């Protein structure tokens, strides 16, 4: 499921004009639901910080440093270096107009949500309060008109997805597992049709909620529609991932490699995509042609990361959130 999600992240960052609203309705929410599903409280806050340091923060800081190194070296004298570094340390997409964590905002946002969950996600009551406070803060920010691109406001927007994922793994696990087994043994054609119909519905409904920008904490014109489409789109991807399990066979090891390397793909996919995308921009100038062209470019980018992630895992596992040895 993470592989499907990262594909839509890659494709979405090509900004296909006909598919943009459709993709942005669910391509980021699905990752927060998955993250919530996989989360659990550590025995202590110290243990949480230690785990987060290796699995999230070290890859985050290294990738941000690699991406911003040219800016940091060339702008020491005019102060932009320090503004960018401060933005990276505090989770700003940009800080005072200077590039900071940019596409790595998701990782810092995830760290903040995990920390909030570790501190206040102990029981149903605290989870409800955490979710309600996040929603209130999110609505207040959207109504304020501020435009900051900060991981804290992004975390407020994403927290309901994260909590929903956690509940699927815990309190809702029994019906969730039953549905999983039911889909696995049911007709592939039936559930393919269900996923397709849901995607078609999202495609036509998503434009009714313009302005969705999760990296800016923006839910668009209608918050209820934002959360509804995020859940429905994630459910559709989940169906497709279950069906894919039945036909993947020996290719599953490559999917596992891609799934384990989402941090690296998130950080560097545009560096791989840009040179491949140039012919598409040059020759396919129409909207339909550009959408189709970038769809296949996104597949090529994903495939290119299979050997790249093998090299990273072998020689620089810290980028994958792993310790050596």
Residue positions per predicted region:
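Alpha-helical transmembrane segments and their immediate juxtamembrane cytosolic regions
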Residues: 1-325
């Amino acid at each position: 499921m993470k592989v499907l999600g990262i594909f839509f992240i890659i494709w979405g960052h090509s900004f296909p004009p006909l598919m943009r609203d459709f993709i942005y309705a669910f391509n980021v929410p699905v990752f927060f639901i998955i993250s919530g599903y996989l989360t659990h409280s550590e025995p202590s806050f110290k243990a949480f910080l230690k785990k987060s340091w290796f699995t999230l923060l070290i890859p985050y800081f290294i990738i941000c440093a690699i991406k911003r190194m040219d800016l940091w070296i060339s702008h020491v004298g005019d102060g932009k270096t320090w503004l960018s570094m401060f933005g990276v340390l505090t989770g700003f997409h940009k800080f005072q107009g200077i590039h900071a964590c940019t596409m790595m905002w998701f990782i810092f946002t995830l760290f903040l949500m995990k920390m909030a969950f570790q501190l206040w996600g102990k029981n149903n009551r605290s989870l409800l309060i955490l979710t309600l406070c996040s929603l209130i803060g999110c609505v207040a920010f959207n109504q304020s008109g501020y435009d900051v691109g900060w991981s804290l406001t992004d975390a407020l927007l994403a927290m309901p997805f994260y909590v929903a994922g956690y509940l699927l793994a815990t309190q809702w696990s029994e019906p969730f597992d039953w549905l999983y087994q039911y889909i696995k043994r049911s007709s592939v054609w039936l559930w393919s049709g269900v996923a397709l119909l849901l995607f078609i519905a999202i495609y036509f409904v998503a434009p009714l909620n313009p302005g969705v920008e999760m990296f800016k904490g923006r839910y668009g014109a209608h918050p209820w529609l934002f959360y509804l489409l995020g859940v429905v789109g994630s459910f559709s991807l989940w169906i497709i991932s279950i069906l894919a399990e039945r036909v993947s066979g020996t290719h599953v090891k490559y999917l596992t490699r891609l799934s384990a390397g989402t941090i690296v793909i998130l950080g560097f996919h545009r560096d791989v995509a840009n040179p491949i995308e140039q012919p598409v921009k040059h020759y396919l100038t129409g909207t339909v042609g550009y959408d189709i062209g970038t769809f296949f470019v996104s597949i090529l980018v994903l495939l290119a990361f299979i050997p790249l992630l093998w090299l990273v895992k072998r020689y620089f596992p810290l980028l994958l959130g792993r310790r050596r040895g």
